[in-house]
A protein has these predicted regions:
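Conserved active-site alpha-helix within GNAT-family acetyltransferase domains
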Residues: 89, 101, 113-130, 138-140
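Residue-level "edge-of-site" marker
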Residues: 51, 112, 134
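Acetyl-CoA-dependent GNAT
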Residues: 3-81, 92-94, 98, 150-151
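Conserved GNAT acetyl-CoA-binding A-motif
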Residues: 99-111
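Hydrophobic beta-strand residues of extracellular immunoglobulin-like
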Residues: 30-33, 107, 145
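Residues within well-ordered alpha-helical secondary structure of globular protein domains
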Residues: 1-4, 123
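Active-site acidic-Proline motif in GNAT/NAT acetyltransferases
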Residues: 79-81, 85, 112-113
Length: 151
């Protein structure tokens, strides 16, 4: 499904050498897969803050709490054929509930150019913390929107 999403939407922007490892980083707390009609239709992960995550630091500075009080929602994608069924919102709800059950505040970073994701997050009530520039490599600079789940 990840390859299908990458071909259709360009996500992830940089195709990983090992898609399985990309989906299960060492910082992973939990992940979920959605199925529709017996087929994998989507995925989401929940991780501890890592290098390059801007949203945890922004939220912790605003909240006056440690960055360790956050959980990063990441690796959300829905197969193109499965869109329009609420799968993205369902997966987001699961990740948010898990973070909150662990006493963590959910945050996320998203490319500003990923307008479908931005629309989903804002429709779900996520609050924009900031828009920042990130240097992903010497030749790749991107604009990222940082969000926190509503309190």
């Amino acid at each position: 499904v990840l390859a299908e999403v990458h071909e259709h939407d360009g996500y992830p922007v940089n195709w990983p050498d090992s898609p399985g490892a990309w989906l299960t980083p060492p910082s992973l707390i939990a992940s979920w897969v959605a199925e529709l009609d017996g087929r994998v239709a989507g995925h989401i992960g929940l991780s501890r803050s890592g290098v390059g995550d801007a949203a945890p630091g922004l939220w912790s500075a605003r909240a006056g709490l440690s960055i360790d009080a956050t959980a990063v929602v990441n690796r959300l994608f829905v197969a193109p054929w499965a869109r329009g069924h609420g799968i993205g919102a369902l997966l987001m709800g699961q990740a948010v509930a898990e973070a909150q059950d662990r006493g963590l505040h959910p945050v996320l970073d998203v490319l500003a150019s990923d307008t479908a994701a931005v629309v989903l997050y804002e429709r779900l009530g996520w609050q924009l913390l900031a828009t920042v520039e990130q240097q992903w490599s010497p030749e790749q600079k991107v604009t990222v929107r940082c969000y926190a789940a509503a309190t």
